[in-house]
Amino acid sequence: MKIFLDDIRSIPRGFEGVRSYNDCIRYLNQNKGKITDISLDHDLGEIRNGYDVCKWIVENEYYEGLERIIIHSANPVGVKNMLQLLDRYCPK
């Protein structure tokens, strides 16, 4: 199962879409062990963003069992921060 977090973009074929931080965390909790790929946007048009999802993934060790975490954001600073967090705390 693959999930795609973005508040604006169309959901690519093969992905399940979520539009907000809260929806994403709820979906992750409901499907633990079933998700292989997560594609994250940074800017979600709300207080919490894709970086907050990355922090949740790290804090809950949700990366175990994931094949890929993809950052598809157009925000270069957000992308850099998300990648640094994941590179530092998630096993390769």
Indicate where each model-derived feature is located.
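Catalytic phosphate/metal-binding cores of nucleic-acid and nucleotide-processing enzymes, i.e., regions
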Residues: M1-K92
